Amino acid sequence: MTYTRDYHNREFEAFSRAELASGGPDPQVKIIAEAITRLGGSDVEKTWRAGAFISAYTCGAAASIWAQLGWEDSSEMISAFLRMHGEYLPTRRERRTIWGADRVKWTKNLVSWSALAARVAEWKDLAYPALYDTISKNTTYFGRYATMKVIEVLHRAGVVAAGQTDIRPIGAKYPRRTLAWLFGYDIGTIDSDRNDDMALATVNAIAEDLKLKYAIESWFDFETLLCNYRQSLRGKYPGRSHDRELAHWRKAEPYWRPETQARWIPFYEIRAQLFPHEFLGEIGGWSGARPELEAALTRRHKGVVQHDTLIKKEREHGA
């Protein structure tokens, strides 16, 4: 069985509306931007905090790093801190690029970011393409999504003027493939090897109709929804990001003490303020991802996972 453009459009719309209603698609970005705004400080400090969060993708790690390290700290201090405490700094699998018991990659990442943060006055007013290039070229172990994500945090926190303005084609294989599903294109028609004007125009012309159709406010949210929809075919239910983040936060709490964590990121307070309470495990009584919801969504899309050629290839290669 081949799943059609109509099927994917219907399911993408249903998933996107539910994910947006939950406060997604990337609620951690909103939490961190709010926490940075509340803490105040200079643009350098705000920028450092944004990148420290991106290094691990969890609020629990961010609060701990913010409490113990600053942008002026030496690489030796950063390395010593990470080697001593890294086990209790939860990181998402998406940031496995900085994993390693010696913490060398994580140290390089934070050192490179602190150097860039110190010069934020030089680049904070750049237009999005130049801003993206500046961050991606000057930060070690920041890939495509990490660069997009830190720009979104800085934009929401009022540090940089530019938010995301397009879907950079290069490296965007998952959102690009979802666009191919939604429009019935072969993925080869959406170029993946360059970010020149023609490639950008092709991808963005395809995307703009959907972005407007579903009233999605930002390009960052739109691209994240494209990726999340693909993951929903394998069980990523609307609101799962909230559940995973709660589990990460609670992993860090016993080691760092709840009152210390909350002084830097009032996690539960911000979540209760920003998001519908029915999606929050600390209110509803669960403490992490809910397997029963993952299983239900996987069953719903069982045919897609079994029969869609692209999904099958990605599963075979562990994507």
Ranges and model annotations:
Residues 51, 102-113, 203, 225-227, ...:
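Generic hydrophobic, helix-prone segments enriched in Leu/Val/Ile
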Residues 53-58, 139, 154, 179-183:
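Generic structural signal for hydrophobic core residues of well-folded globular domains
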Residues 1-93, 317:
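N-terminal polyanion-binding entry modules of DNA glycosylases/AP lyases
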Residues 79-97, 208-224:
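Charged/polar, low-hydrophobicity segments characteristic of intrinsically disordered regions
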Residues 90-140:
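Helix-hairpin-helix/helix-loop-helix acidic hairpins
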Residues 1-39, 116, 120-131, 148, ...:
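C-terminal accessory module of base-excision DNA glycosylases/AP lyases that mediates lesion recognition
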